[in-house]
A protein has these predicted regions:
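Extended, well-ordered protein cores
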Residues: 1-258
């Protein structure tokens, strides 16, 4: 039996409901457009996922069920995307473009995620700011996101890098690091490039500028895993998955320790 990828798509299936499959049945257009939608959904949802705190939860309108933590954030972000929360075109809700992303703010996120005094979400403003910064990146990189400045055009760029329909996962990962390095809070940098989820440790020895640095890139790796299924559904075979690591966080660390 094939074990599913550790990707955001598993959270969209919480409660025994495959929300993506249900949405996909309503889609019109070719496989590439479907893949663009999946890429946008994965990226925005992953970037909105962080510790929600013990008191927050999301009541799903369709089912009436309440979900908390990562599962709740997944369902809430799925609904936000589906309703056109990242689209600048009311006639085309299933898209994430630079203009809508750039103006995304905490009030819109609070409304979409049902945040009230009795249902507080940790890091609300920071999450919204991260999405807005993605809009700036999408606008500034037509080489990755096309002249139309749409987040989903990252699919077209990645598919164009495949050779004979085959794409190494390391190329997906490197593209994500290149594309989104400006959005991360800067602790460490090399020649003005923010390194993101990279930390110092004296045991990490190297003979170049990475001396003393340990890369984790948890969210970027999770994004890479989460883009595999959209690409493969569109006919791009992703290979060399073992080149990535397990996500460096407490649950996976505990699993490896066990």
């Amino acid at each position: 039996r094939r074990v599913p990828f550790h990707a955001r798509w598993r959270h969209f299936e919480v409660g025994g409901r495959d929300r993506w499959a249900a949405l996909a049945k309503t889609l019109k257009g070719d496989a590439a457009e479907r893949a663009r939608i999946r890429v946008e959904l994965a990226i925005t949802s992953v970037l909105l996922d962080a510790g929600a705190g013990p008191d927050w939860g999301y009541r799903e309108p369709d089912s009436g069920e309440r979900y908390a933590r990562s599962e709740g954030l997944a369902v809430a972000s799925f609904d936000l995307y589906r309703r056109g929360g990242f689209s600048n075109d009311p006639a085309k809700p299933l898209r994430a473009d630079a203009e809508a992303l750039k103006r995304f703010g905490a009030p819109a996120l609070a409304m979409a995620f049902q945040v009230f005094p009795h249902n507080p979400l940790i890091g609300l403003a920071g999450r919204a700011a991260l999405i807005a910064s993605v809009g700036g990146v999408v606008a500034a990189r037509p080489d990755l996101f096309g002249a139309g400045a749409r987040l989903g055009h990252l699919f077209d760029h990645l598919a164009g890098q495949a050779k004979d329909g085959v794409l190494p996962v390391t190329l997906i990962f490197a593209t994500l690091l290149d594309a989104f390095s400006p959005i991360w809070p800067s602790r460490l940098d090399i020649e003005g490039v923010a390194l993101g989820d990279v930390w110092k440790h004296p045991a990490a020895r190297a003979k170049d500028r990475t001396d003393g640095l340990v890369p984790f890139h948890k969210l970027s790796q999770w994004l890479a895993y989460s883009l595999v299924e959209p690409l493969e559904e569109a006919g791009v075979r992703v290979v060399d998955l073992d080149a990535l690591t397990g996500l460096p966080e407490y649950r996976n660390g505990g699993l490896l320790s066990d």
